[in-house]
């Protein structure tokens, strides 16, 4: 059985989870202007868009499929344009966006086809030469993760998938998988890094900024 989104889980933690794959503004700053249209897919409660707002950007739109996350964001940051979306679709015209943010979103989508569907939608909304800035989690080789990867592989058929005790089903990625997902973008930044997870562990990660081909 494949789980491609877990709306109930993310709605349930909307008021308690703090996300940890943070914006590195210095990496993206050389490529954007104050008038840039910036879209955050999987925006949660809008924390990253608010950082851009504080730096003087105003054309900011966020999408998330968890309605409680959007509701929480509208209360915290009422000046942001936050919307609920479904099925990897964004109510945005084609070729209209300068920058799409995708922060720790692919980790929440365990199905290859659904991941690619989202990347195709991002390609659609980006202007020619527009940018994607994504960060996400890569495979780890410590015993705790290796055990849960094996359990997840037996249950879901994809190595790197695992369950959290509180109900989330997540995925850590092989670097080759990330290259496949980003093949339609010209790399501007492609870095390996370490991220803290929502539950306080450390994980291998990737930061990728690419230009639409």
Give a label for each model feature.
Residues 24, 114-115:
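Residues at alpha-helix caps and immediate loop-helix transition turns in enzyme cores, especially N-
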Residues 116-128:
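A short glycine-rich, Lys/Arg-flanked "PGG" loop and its adjoining helix->strand segment in the class I
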């Amino acid at each position: 059985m494949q789980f491609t989104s877990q709306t109930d889980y993310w709605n349930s933690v909307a008021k308690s989870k703090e996300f940890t794959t943070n914006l590195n503004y210095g990496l993206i700053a050389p490529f954007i202007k104050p008038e840039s249209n910036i879209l955050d897919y999987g925006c949660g409660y809008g924390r990253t868009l608010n950082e851009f707002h504080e730096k003087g950007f105003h054309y900011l739109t966020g999408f998330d499929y968890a309605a409680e996350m959007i509701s929480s964001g509208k209360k915290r940051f009422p000046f942001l344009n936050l919307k609920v979306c479904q099925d990897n679709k964004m109510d945005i015209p084609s070729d209209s966006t300068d920058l799409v943010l995708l922060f720790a979103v692919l980790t929440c989508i365990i199905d290859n086809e659904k991941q690619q569907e989202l990347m195709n939608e991002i390609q659609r909304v980006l202007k020619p030469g527009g940018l994607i800035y994504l960060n996400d989690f890569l495979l780890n080789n410590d015993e705790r993760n290796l055990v849960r990867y094996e359990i997840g592989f037996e249950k879901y058929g994809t190595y790197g998938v695992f369950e959290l005790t509180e109900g989330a089903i997540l995925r850590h990625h092989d670097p080759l998988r990330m290259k496949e997902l980003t093949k339609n973008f010209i790399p501007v930044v492609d870095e390996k890094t370490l991220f803290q997870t929502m539950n306080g562990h450390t994980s291998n990660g990737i930061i990728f900024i690419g230009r639409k081909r």
